[in-house]
From Swiss-Prot:
GO terms for molecular function: 4 iron, 4 sulfur cluster binding; metal ion binding; N6-isopentenyladenosine methylthiotransferase activity. Residues 142-370 form the Radical SAM core domain. It comes from Hydrogenobaculum sp. (strain Y04AAS1). It catalyses: N(6)-dimethylallyladenosine(37) in tRNA + (sulfur carrier)-SH + AH2 + 2 S-adenosyl-L-methionine = 2-methylsulfanyl-N(6)-dimethylallyladenosine(37) in tRNA + (sulfur carrier)-H + 5'-deoxyadenosine + L-methionine + A + S-adenosyl-L-homocysteine + 2 H(+). This is tRNA-2-methylthio-N(6)-dimethylallyladenosine synthase. It is found in: Cytoplasm. It comes from the Bacteria. Binds 2 [4Fe-4S] clusters. One cluster is coordinated with 3 cysteines and an exchangeable S-adenosyl-L-methionine. Its cofactor is [4Fe-4S] cluster. Its EC number is 2.8.4.3. It holds the Pfam family UPF0004. Catalyzes the methylthiolation of N6-(dimethylallyl)adenosine (i(6)A), leading to the formation of 2-methylthio-N6-(dimethylallyl)adenosine (ms(2)i(6)A) at position 37 in tRNAs that read codons beginning with uridine. [4Fe-4S] cluster 1 binds at C10, C46, C80. Keywords: 4Fe-4S, Cytoplasm, Iron, Iron-sulfur, Metal-binding, S-adenosyl-L-methionine, Transferase, tRNA processing.
Amino acid sequence: MKYFIKTYGCQMNINDSEKIKGILQTQGYEPATREEDADLVILNTCTIREKPDQKVWSHLGEIKKLKSINPNIKIGVCGCMAQRAGYEIASKMPFIDLVFGTKNIHHMPKLLEDVKVGNRAIEILEEEDPSENILDSYPTVRDNSYCAYVTIMRGCDKECTYCVVPFTRGKERSRNPQSILDEVKSLVDSGVMEIHLIGQNVTAYGKDIDYPFYKLLENISKIEGVKRIRFTTGHPIDMTDDIIETMANLPNMVNHLHLPFQAGSDRILELMKRNYTKAYYLNRIEKLKAKIKDITFSTDIIIGFPTETEEDFQHTLDVVQTVEFEQVFSFKYSKRPNTPAYYMEDDLTDEIKTDRIKRLLEIQKAITSKLMQRYKNTVQKVLVEDKKGNTYIGRTTTNVWCNITSSQDILGKEVEVLIAKAGFQSLDGVVQNIL
């Protein structure tokens, strides 16, 4: 039997898909390279915005055609959209065999047994399952041999008014620290060099178990063989001085941080229930820059939140120009069911949102181009993750992709690279030294 998984959305979904692959392979499934060749197709969905929902509905329409050609193929839907609207999906798409949410991935073996005997398996848990941590002990099939996602917590307590995550992922639950350290040790033993800690709000890790995030960073840093540590995503209000000091002091912390600010206007931030101000966010950035040499930033921005004025938008542009992010992920606001903002009037036209996002991206393009040119003729540490043709591909400690020329096999190695060319999205360079 063969499976095919299509993953939408964030790093958490990617890691969940890696867990699902591991479960499937323990059940005797092998990976297929195409949906058409699979006995089981699973869509791991995202519902953070309206657009991912639309993509899933469209994809399900295509899969319906596939099922009409091959009635024996089994179709599954999981992830955040399934958690939010799983019963609706099952009702509208009766050809779907399997639906489960974000809180019961570990139930897959039982659900698969139901599907194998011809039953539909539809299970959406409203409450967190105390046994969900067993998922952390399941085998994981990773696409990257040298960089690995490690889930350290699930859920979010922040209750931002636009965000569906508290509904789809539940309350914050920190994973047992020893379980995390054991997984990291196992990954390093298998050849992994970079540990990427993930969660809906990793900087809130440990609040429910009296084990602060900075302490977890310190203990992971001590594990022999961990070359790099990065984490995604944090919340500015939880980016404490202790975390910043720890990041600055650990030799294997990367000097890049993704820190969403969402909007620059204090009025809009209050409506979003972000619980910080523009000044507070800029203070965190200033402290990080002062403590961590050459640190770079990326961020998320929502454009056109209800009642956003031109003056509000100018505050957002001011943050972008002040911080000088290397990368910005910007999105037009779209109301999501099960959020407080769903009941606010979406009073900005699509034309206004499109105009503002275009202006933002024009400013960001100039900033990125300027920052990328600073890499030219410098030597950067790069962890080599892939090879395409004769070119090796890796990332700098500042999270920039680099295409590398080398006469030696450097796959899976950390190398020093002399940057010869700086493009808009990547660098080109030649190996100077293998570390």
